[in-house]
């Protein structure tokens, strides 16, 4: 029986597909912002399963919702009603201000669902001729890895060697309002699918007016704005949604401040909606869009199952009751300001950017270099887990439950790692 980290890594290499390149650490336990490897060493988790663990590892209320429901009724399919789905649907639609929600499992499934909704609306409501609807997307996007989604990816790692590709998508530069305006001149455009902050691209934060201006343009052209908030939503950027802007969400409730909030026609959620314990995703829209899909035209055996619904309700309640978006804002400021003071002047550092607790450090080296990877190995040795993205960028996104003192300790460790690393160059 395998016991050491090496044993477990060897098992994965022998029996698992080689579609990931994990940091060499084998985890077996987590609590709050901390995780432990099989040898018992503790680490600060600064990835949060790509922002799926916003409420912290093993939150007792969320785990309790999972266990209690699993003991009672786990799965019915949607062939029958269940007693948890309706209450969840009411809670999430009221939370974010939409008429309807369609529950799915993974983020990629939710994006696929949004694409189908947009196309169906385009044909039934907007009147675009059959099979001619187009959806605008952005360069450097990441919305998943299904065959449809990779068809509009600009990342060769995602799409190369997996054609033929699905037609009906047009890419424009991110954060480019004039390019969007020009693309929207095509009467066959049905939707604009966009990340309010591009996470996988390296935490690219657009101009503050980008999403709101995009919404205005979409409305003027009768085009649906589809916000992919799978990674940015549920408090990660310091508000319930990144499209809330800097509204504040001071009470822990989604206040939808009309001066800052941009309302997407289709809202896509996932990751932290699960509380980090069970796959849950959701697509929200009003009746004019959602009710274009009828029975038999879309569905999922596990989507909206009793466990998922119960877990998601608990995950949302924890966010509100503990006002975690407020902590994300405070600790995010602490992270960026503290790191800039400590390492901002190093030649190794090209920049520090982000919003809330979704942040990135840009390493002053080429994307093809191993510098960011080597830094993550050094951070691991210092008890901090993070992962490079796009070669020379390190993303830092701890659970939103991280305390001020924990952040301070993590910053001190990071300062030591980056400073010592530069001295070896």
Give short role names for the model-derived ranges.
Residues 2-425:
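Conserved N-terminal phosphate-binding loop of PLP-dependent enzymes in the Aspartate aminotransferase
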